[in-house]
Amino acid sequence: MKTGLFFLCLLGTAAAIPTNARLLSDHSKPTAETVAPDNTAIPSLRAEAEENEKETAVSTEDDSHHKAEKSSVLKSKEESHEQSAEQGKSSSQELGLKDQEDSDGHLSVNLEYAPTEGTLDIKEDMSEPQEKKLSENTDFLAPGVSSFTDSNQQESITKREENQEQPRNYSHHQLNRSSKHSQGLRDQGNQEQDPNISNGEEEEEKEPGEVGTHNDNQERKTELPREHANSKQEEDNTQSDDILEESDQPTQVSKMQEDEFDQGNQEQEDNSNAEMEEENASNVNKHIQETEWQSQEGKTGLEAISNHKETEEKTVSEALLMEPTDDGNTTPRNHGVDDDGDDDGDDGGTDGPRHSASDDYFIPSQAFLEAERAQSIAYHLKIEEQREKVHENENIGTTEPGEHQEAKKAENSSNEEETSSEGNMRVHAVDSCMSFQCKRGHICKADQQGKPHCVCQDPVTCPPTKPLDQVCGTDNQTYASSCHLFATKCRLEGTKKGHQLQLDYFGACKSIPTCTDFEVIQFPLRMRDWLKNILMQLYEANSEHAGYLNEKQRNKVKKIYLDEKRLLAGDHPIDLLLRDFKKNYHMYVYPVHWQFSELDQHPMDRVLTHSELAPLRASLVPMEHCITRFFEECDPNKDKHITLKEWGHCFGIKEEDIDENLLF
């Protein structure tokens, strides 16, 4: 026991001096100035030293107990952490005892080799021997040990409470992280904690110790300021927690209100969307119903209108299709149209192949006749199809009783059969007349067996005329048109008058003077110049309207057209025309050949007949009254045929320049 007490006394002397020095300082930072005076004033009596130590220990204990009580009062608000705090106190006491024993062991080992800060200051400032200082330290043994034990216990308690406080604060901050105000307060609390921690670290760094040694005296020096700092930190934490709780309550309430408001808005939006969808669906259904009603009404209206139009078209088409004939019977109008088309064909057939002396210049070409006939056939077929559709629509659209409807169907079927048979006969007749040609004044008509034959055309069936369509016949009579003239000729067929009646010239009949010999000599000069000017006009018109001249013809005319020496069209005197012919002979060679090829069409046998010359004659007689005598002079052998050589000689073309290769 004595050895144990002695050992404790030695430990007390080691711990007494720095503990007293720490308690005397206001900022928990011992310096040489604060420690040195206490250590330099060596007491004369042991009793005084012991009393002073007791007083300081009692004050330290009172301070630490007061802080512990304050922290426990602040922590009593949290009921959930009381039990853990009590357990922490008991465990901290046990840990404090263990720490005391460990510190005793360490102090016994390092006592001789680890002088404290107080002894270092004494060595530097005082000249007293080491034994006196050690005796002074031993005087402060008991109070040092007690104060050390109490400080360890209080430190462990405060650490437990701090460790419990920190997770509570952390969880509290996590729950209120969305609030900006609570975040600012949390940052402020952290800033308040950081200086305390940094101050503690600075204190630990400022307390010197020798390198390579584990000095427990330095740890004990820092324990009391740590208690003070930890207690202060706990007060700040509790205050900040109270502030955070108070500040978080309105933010939580506002957040709940916002959630409720958002939820209410969302419900309103959902309700409004549902209402809009219902309204849209109802509107769509109404629109569909209205469109259905309108479509039904439109269908009925359209059916009525179409039926009305079809009946009107039927009556009009039937009226147009039927017309009176010479026999008093009614014949289809479209057949009469074909007759009109064949009218010209008949005239052409009369005057063309049979070469009767008539006006062949105005006979339509075969292509024109065929196109006209095809058009009439297509029109006829279209009318028949429309009539069939009208009958079908009438059958479908009727809403009459069943018996009457069946009777009407029977009538319609019989009518359709009759019309179809008539239509077939008409189509067959039209097809047979397509390849059958009649001379002018005649029309093609098929008999009951479908065989085509030519009949005379009624002048009434000729198309409407204009004043410019008038022609003059050889009987010196003016006719409304060539159709009327040749229809009259057909009726007079078999008589002398009918045989002699021909188309003399275009226009109304007038007095034609007799051609003299001098005029016959001058006629070829005017005729050559006229043919040349006609080609120039066709060349100019062909650039805008293709089809007048082919490529070879254009190349030939181009040379004449671009020649600067060409005599322009005009009323020139005979002397000028003769001089130009001699000077620019080559410009007149091709126009003479071109006119022969234009007249040699029915047939193209390199020979011109009177019928082929008739178109040119009829157009020139009113201006050139010598044209008839000129054509008579061109046929010296009087065979009624004019060859290319005879034609060339009449126009003064040399025999070596007459070439059939120019007939293209």
Curated annotation (Swiss-Prot):
The modification Phosphoserine is found at residues 76, 84, 92, 171, 272, 358, 365, 420. It is found in: Secreted, Extracellular space, Extracellular matrix. The keyword Repeat does not apply. Residues 622-657 form the EF-hand domain. GO terms for molecular function: calcium ion binding; collagen binding; extracellular matrix binding. Highly expressed in lymph node, brain, heart, lung, skeletal muscle, ovary, small intestine, and colon, with lower levels in placenta, pancreas, testis, spleen, and thymus, and no expression in kidney, liver, and peripheral blood leukocytes. Disulfide bonds join 433-444, 438-454, 456-490, 462-483, 472-509, 515-626, 634-650. Residues 1-16 form the signal peptide. SUPFAM superfamilies: EF-hand, EGF/Laminin, Kazal-type serine protease inhibitors. Residues 85-94, 146-156, 188-199 have a biased composition (Polar residues). Residues 170-180 have a biased composition (Basic residues). N- and O-glycosylated. O-glycosylated with a core 1 or possibly core 8 glycan. Residues 236-248, 259-280, 339-349 have a biased composition (Acidic residues). Residues 432-454 form the Follistatin-like domain. Keywords: Calcium, Disulfide bond, Extracellular matrix, Glycoprotein, Metal-binding, Phosphoprotein, Secreted, Signal. Glycans are attached at residues 31, 40, 44, 116, 169, 176, 196, 280, 331, 398, 412, 476. Belongs to the SPARC family. This is SPARC-like protein 1. The lineage of its organism: Eukaryota, Metazoa, Chordata, Craniata, Vertebrata.
